[in-house]
């Protein structure tokens, strides 16, 4: 059960890190008074999260190596 959850999380993180979509921040034009630039939508939050995953590719690679080691040593039968 724990092994399945760890594998699921690892695969999900890998999928987010290797996406090659051109994710750019949406440029909003300032409206002046009443500009609500502090709030962002769920889509923008997901986009920012996927962009941040790209910067952590080396750590994700190290996590993958650790998970392979755990799969062989701890979860192997």
UniProtKB/Swiss-Prot annotation:
Belongs to the SMIM7 family. Its main location: membrane. It comes from Danio rerio (Zebrafish). Residues 77 are cytoplasmic. The chain crosses the membrane at residues 56-76. Keywords: Membrane, Signal, Transmembrane, Transmembrane helix. It is found in: Membrane. It comes from the Eukaryota. Residues 18-55 are extracellular. This is Small integral membrane protein 7. The lineage of its organism: Eukaryota, Metazoa, Chordata, Craniata, Vertebrata. InterPro entries: SMIM7 (IPR037659). One of its GO terms (cellular component) is membrane. Residues 1-17 form the signal peptide. It is a single-pass type I membrane protein.
């Amino acid at each position: 059960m724990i092994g399945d959850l760890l594998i699921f999380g690892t695969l999900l993180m890998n999928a987010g890190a290797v996406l090659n979509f051109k994710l750019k921040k949406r440029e909003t034009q300032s409206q002046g008074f009443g500009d609500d630039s502090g709030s962002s939508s769920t889509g923008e939050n997901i986009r920012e999260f996927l962009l941040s995953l790209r910067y952590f590719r080396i750590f994700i690679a190290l996590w993958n190596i650790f998970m392979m080691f755990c799969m062989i040593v701890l979860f192997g039968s």
